[in-house]
Amino acid sequence: MAVEDKVKTLYEDGIVALKGAFYVEWVEAMREDMMTAFWSAIQRPGGAVGRGPRRWYVEIHPQDFRGFADLAAHPWVVEMAGAVCGPKFEIVEIGFDVPFQGAKNQPWHRDFPSPTDTYVDKRITSLAFNLTGVDVTPDMGPFEIAIGTQWEDGRSWNHEMFPTKEEWPKFAERGVRKFPQRGDISCRSALTIHRGTAHGSPIARPVMVLGIDAPGAGHSALHDMMMTKDYHDALPETVRQHLICRVVETLVPISQKHDIEGLVMGAE
């Protein structure tokens, strides 16, 4: 499917995917890096942010993810980012979600308030690329997304992100649970209403998140990407030119800024 068709699907559904973008061996290394980063982050204040019971989000340094350059330079990622967010798109976030056994249904939500560019002008100005670390099965609390809801205004919602419970049935009717396999990439608007679901499996389900902005979208203020100069200089220029990050002598632990208060307790 041509990138134009993928963009059309994204604008209609709020999400689109590419199957088999990476080899399983590459994904296994990504999963190992995510879980190593999780066990480090959970031990320090602000390192892992709760997104509900037994569910966390962790931002990582790009150089702690061996596949960062591969992901940021992947032709489909670059094509989608350029087509949706423009040729000067910005890479503003790298991190991962991980639910464990006992994670509950999240409330239906979006990840930040909708800008007028989206709810008035019907333009998508930011993207989240997701890569699962495991082959997702029904007992792993699959990601559920309410198709086509990225255009909802949302200004009357709690924090402009959380629809009222009275509205949940509307989103449930449009909800589709996703079962990606290792190597797949999805691309979504984080404004499309979604939730993580109850996780009964003893196997954790980490999923990598690469955040992309159009210039001016402003989400870099929610993050603090940093890398050392030698790592930065070794990246391909095609990646470097899109990075919104600090170049530092020594990496320091990330203290996360994007805490979504309404997710802390879960929905049930």
Where are these regions (language model features)?
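Non-heme Fe(II)-dependent double-stranded beta-helix
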Residues: M1-D13, L18-Y119, H223
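Non-heme Fe(II)/2-oxoglutarate
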Residues: T192-E268
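Short edge-strand/loop segments of extracellular domains
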Residues: F100, A146-D153, G211-A217
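Active-site glycine-rich loop that binds ribose-phosphate moieties when present
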Residues: R110-D117, L131, P163-F171
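Short, conserved beta-strand element in jelly-roll/cupin
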Residues: T118-P138, F179-R182, C187, L210-A214
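Double-stranded beta-helix
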Residues: V136-T197
